[in-house]
A protein has these predicted regions:
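N-terminal Rossmann-like NAD(P) cofactor-binding subdomain of oxidoreductases
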Residues: 1-179, 197-199, 267-269
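Contiguous C-terminal substrate-recognition/catalytic subdomains in enzyme active sites
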Residues: 62, 172-261
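Short C-terminal domain-edge/linker segments immediately following a structured domain
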Residues: 35-37, 59-65, 101-104, 164, ...
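Short, surface-exposed acidic/glycine-rich loop or hinge patches that mediate macromolecular interfaces
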Residues: 11, 136, 209, 224, ...
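Short, solvent-exposed beta-strand edge segments and adjacent coil->beta transition regions
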Residues: 129, 214-218, 272-274
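C-terminal active-site/capping subdomain that shapes the small-molecule cofactor and substrate pocket
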Residues: 220-311
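Predominant activation on well-ordered alpha-helical scaffold segments within soluble catalytic domains
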Residues: 18, 143-147, 184-188, 192, ...
Length: 311
């Protein structure tokens, strides 16, 4: 069994990781670290776990007795602080959901980390990687929408990204980002690994949706390539990836809710190529991809623990 621990144990990301790992056949959860909630039952904070586990939060981190650590605190600086205050044993696999090391993992050849979007980076994850820096939720949707174009050197015009995502603390329709976005650097970095010539302008409009989970994005740009040719590029790029699907109808949030799926739809209205994409930002955009990455790092079948569940 893989012995797993979670830091940042009271976060929504930790809750979703726990919900997946509790039913994962190859994982034993040995520690959920949250000093601020020490001694409390997990279910007192994460109400969806009532009756599923009787574990309690702890301030301890048995770092020498675990195989994988999920760092679930997404506040900037949280993972850097953890790494600076703990002696990490060689061989411990770390899956980091914070933004702290994303750009380093993309831009620094000496970095021990892998930018862990599973679709383009499966090989380094299965070939001995010990640190994985998970993409942000918007990047988790936008990159699958654009990577097949980058691979074929087709990102040569301004890219417009209109997205609506769950944001419980904001009013529906409230702007979250206009023109610029905090995940722009990692999106550009990941695209640049496939298309070194990529320097196109990227313009963002991101608003809050009136729901708890889910991110829907429309990405559009000018393109001279026919939609049939583009569909072939996408089908080829994702042909051996279990969770990213190219659909012939517009994706809905209902299709992806509670799943690790990313559904993409392509259409053309010359000269515009329009790409619609939908994910569950708490699962595919965070916890589900983190477990997917763990499966790859430990040589498991990538769908283990992530199959569609009844509700």
């Amino acid at each position: 069994m893989i012995k797993a621990a979670i830091s940042g144990g009271t976060t929504p990301q930790a809750r979703e990781i726990l919900k997946i790992l509790i039913n994962h056949p190859d994982v034993e959860i040995v520690c959920v670290n949250a000093p601020e909630a020490e001694g409390m039952l997990l279910s007192q904070v994460h109400r969806g776990l009532r009756g599923e586990t009787f574990m309690r939060f702890t301030s301890q981190m048995p770092i020498d007795d675990i195989d994988v650590l999920f760092m679930a605190d997404t506040e900037p600086g949280a993972s850097m602080k953890f790494m600076a205050t703990h002696s990490v044993p060689e061989g411990l696999k770390i899956i980091d959901l914070s933004p702290d090391f994303r750009e380093e993992s993309l831009n620094d050849a000496e970095s021990p980390g892998v930018y862990a979007l599973p679709e383009p980076h499966r090989k380094p994850l299965v070939r001995g990687a010990t640190r994985a820096s998970m993409p942000g939720p918007l990047a988790s949707a936008v990159l699958p929408a654009l990577l097949p174009l980058a691979k074929n050197l087709l990102l040569n015009s301004t890219i417009h990204i209109n997205a609506v995502q769950a944001e419980p603390q904001a009013e529906p329709g409230e702007p979250l980002a206009l023109l610029e976005h905090e995940e722009d650097a990692e999106i550009r970095g990941a695209l640049g690994t496939l298309q070194a010539s990529f320097h196109s302008e990227m313009l963002y409009v991101v608003t809050a949706g009136g729901w708890q989970n889910g991110l829907a994005a429309t990405v559009y740009m000018e393109s001279a390539v026919s939609v049939n040719e583009i569909e072939k590029l996408y089908e080829e790029f994702f042909s051996d990836h279990s969770f990213t699907l190219v659909a012939d109808t517009l994706p809905t949030l209902m299709e992806v809710a509670g799943t690790n799926k990313c559904i993409i739809h392509l259409q053309k209205s010359d000269p515009w190529l329009v790409i619609n994409v939908a994910i569950d930002d708490k699962i595919k955009g965070a916890a589900g991809s983190a477990v997917h990455v763990m499966n790859l790092m430990f040589g498991l079948q990538e769908r283990v623990g992530l199959m569609l569940k009844s509700h």
